[in-house]
Amino acid sequence: MIAVFRYLFELKEDDGICRQAQNSGTFYLFHNLSPFLKKVGSKYLAPQISVAEMKSMLGKFRQNEQMIEDSVLIGCSDECMAYFALDLGSLEKSVIESELRGLFTELRKAFFQLDGKDAPLLSSAQALLRWHDTHQYCSKTGQPTQKNLAGSKRVCHTNGIIYYPQMSPVVITLVSDGSRCLLARQASFPKGMYSALAGFCDVGETLEETVRREVAEEVGLEVESLWYSASQHWPFPNSSLMIACHAIVQPQQTKISVNKLELEAAGWFSLEEIMEALGREPKPLKQEDGSFSLWLPPKWAIAHQLIQEWVKLQASSPA
C-alpha cells in the first residue's frame, strides 16, 4: 500500500506524471454527476472505460481528446493503474448510453444497486466533480481558477491562492438503551427505510458534544456514554466525512420526543426486528395493510455497519 500512496501523491503533485497515467488508466463516466452503470445479471456495475474507448467515443462526438484532461483522479489499483472520473454532461446522454450499452443513474438511486467496491469510488468521484464545478472562480478576486491535472486542487493565478476540496464533518450515531436500538427516518428517505441519527458538527464542537447535541435535538434523549466506531466519505448533500459512533442512554429514560423539523419518525427496535430487517433487500416492501416493512441502508453504508456492530454486541452480551 505504501507504493500506492506514494504513486497517488506523485500524480497529484506532477502534471507530467499524471498525464502519462491518463494515457494508460481507466475512466468512470458521469453525466451531470450521474454515474454510468451496466447491469450484469442481477447486479449493477460501474464499468471502467479504457483510454482507447474514451478517445474513440470522443471522436464520434467530434470532441477534442484534450477533454480527457477535464477528468479527476479518484484512486488506483494495487498495480498502480490510475482511476479517473470524467463528466460528459456537455454531450448527448442517450447517444453515450447507446454506444456503451448502459445507463446514467442518479447516484442516490445507484447506491442501492452497487456493490461495496464501486460505491466508494463513485462517491469520491461525484464529490470531486461537483466541487470543481462549483469552484471555478476565486472567492477573493472573482477571477477564474484552474485545476491541476489530477483535480486535487484549483489555483487562482491572479493572487496565487490554492483551493483544496473539503469535506464537512458529520456525526452518525446509533443509540441503544442496552437491549434495543433507535432508528429514525427523514421524509426524503425511501418508504420503509430507517437509519441511524446523523447531523453536521457545529463550528467549535468536539465529536462528543456533537453526538450529545444531535441526539437531544432530534429525539429528546440524553446520552450517558458514547464511543467511536469508524468513518466513511459520503457525497451528499455535497461532501461529508461520516464519523460513526455508538451511544448509550439510560434504560429508565427512553421516551422519544421526535423533532418534526428534522425527522419524520423515530422508534426503538428489538434485536429480532433488526435481524429481520437485515435479511431483507435494501428496497421498499409494501405490506397488505399499506405500510412498508422496515429495511436498512445497503451493506457498504456506514449506518449498516453500525447496526451490524450493535447486533454482534447484543449477541456477545450476557442474557
Positions of PLM-derived features:
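N-terminal strand-loop-strand
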Residues: R154-A196, E222, W227-Y228, A247-V249
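Catalytic cores of peptidoglycan-degrading enzymes
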Residues: A187, C201-D202
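Active-site lining segments that contact anionic ligands and/or coordinate catalytic metals
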Residues: V223-S231, S240-A244, L263-E264
